[in-house]
């Protein structure tokens, strides 16, 4: 379901994957990482696991995330990890998923893989479960208003590491899925309440929680 512009969530899953290829409809995950955050961005739980995939990992993908087939020999299978990940999401009673460009890549890729593997879940179906895209629903608007000089510094560039570095957030180890979601978490909770204060308003607190 599309994000309706109100941040009325209490258990947010910040999610990222590393994959075998750059196209969502031909990729499979080689790493899934996620943290569950409360409304203020405090981490409540985490999940991080590499996956022994049956897909060939493209050289271009390995050049980005540094994961090769030899690194996954002793990892669990994709169906095992994805099944446990979906159970973990359910047990954490999440009410939305936050990604960075993940509405166009991570969620449809995971939705396709779950269907292929016979895993019943709605978490990755954009028509059934709410997702927030950290770029299109946050950073793009921040650049429009030139928050902290983002537009001047980055122009049309959008990579998570560039945004993090400009905002003074550590990007060491980028392209490991867990490192990337921690960057995204820090960026989102720094930027979104400032540029979208009405999203964060509550009945008892008419202004931002921050």
Residue ranges of model-derived segments:
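Short, well-structured alpha-helical segments in soluble
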Residues: 83-91
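Long, highly charged low-complexity segments
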Residues: 5-6, 17
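Metal-dependent phosphoesterase signature
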Residues: 64-84
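Short acidic, Gly/Ser-rich segments with clustered Asp/Glu that frequently serve as metal-coordination loops
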Residues: 17-25
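Metal-dependent phosphoesterase core characteristic of DEDDh/y 3'-5' exonuclease domains
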Residues: 3, 10-11, 25-67, 91-210
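Short, hydrophobic/glycine-enriched beta-strand segments
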Residues: 12-16
């Amino acid at each position: 379901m599309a994000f309706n512009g109100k941040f009325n969530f209490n258990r947010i899953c910040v999610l990222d994957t590393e994959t075998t290829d750059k196209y969502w409809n031909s990729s499979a995950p080689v790493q899934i990482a996620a943290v569950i955050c409360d409304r203020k961005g405090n981490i409540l739980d985490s999940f991080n696991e590499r996956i022994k995939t049956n897909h060939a990992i493209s050289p271009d993908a390995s050049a980005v995330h540094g994961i090769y087939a030899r690194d996954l020999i002793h990892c669990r299978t994709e169906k095992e990890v994805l099944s446990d990940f979906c159970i973990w999401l359910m047990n954490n009673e999440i009410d939305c998923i936050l990604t960075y460009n993940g509405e166009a890549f991570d969620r449809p890729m995971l939705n396709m893989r779950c269907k292929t593997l016979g895993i019943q879940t709605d978490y990755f179906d954009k028509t059934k479960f709410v997702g927030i895209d950290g770029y299109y629903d946050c950073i793009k608007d921040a650049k429009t208003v030139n928050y902290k000089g983002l537009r001047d510094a980055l122009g049309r560039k959008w990579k998570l590491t560039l945004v993090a570095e400009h905002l003074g957030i550590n990007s060491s180890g980028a392209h490991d899925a867990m490192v990337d979601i921690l960057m995204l978490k820090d960026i989102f909770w720094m930027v979104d309440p400032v540029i979208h204060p009405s999203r964060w308003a509550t009945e008892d607190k008419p202004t931002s929680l921050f």
